[in-house]
Design a protein with these regions (language model features):
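Residues that scaffold, gate, or flank divalent-cation-dependent active/transport sites
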Residues: 19-107
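Positively charged n-region of N-terminal signal peptides that target proteins for export
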Residues: 1-4
Length: 107
């Protein structure tokens, strides 16, 4: 049983590391403002993915998707989208999709 748990943990760890190192950040601008919890944004040509500091109601004529509980840009990729602006909805971004899925539509 212990061996099975160890193998499962190692497989998950390797898979997680692979996800972080394989994302193509080209064409995207990453910004971070260091606060008690960081303010994070990843900007693509069609809009941006932001952390919980951003309110979609203030994203007038902007396609933005919001993820929360993140501390790094890599965390943003794995997190679930919690809110979307009207313009982001027009691009096909939906609450519940991953940050990676949203970024590919905002790229």
């Amino acid at each position: 049983m212990k061996r099975l748990l160890l193998v499962s943990f190692l497989a998950f760890s390797v898979h997680s590391l692979a996800d972080d190192t394989t994302f193509d950040w080209s064409g995207l601008e990453r910004s971070k403002i260091s606060l008690e919890a960081p303010l994070l944004i990843v900007k693509g040509s069609l809009g941006f993915l932001g952390c919980g500091y951003i309110n979609t109601d203030s994203c007038i004529d902007e396609a933005c998707a919001i993820v929360s509980g993140v501390n790094t840009h890599d965390d943003m990729l794995k997190a679930s989208v919690k809110a979307v602006s009207k313009d982001a909805t027009k691009l096909g971004i939906k609450v519940g999709m991953t940050g990676v899925e949203a970024m590919e539509l905002l790229r």
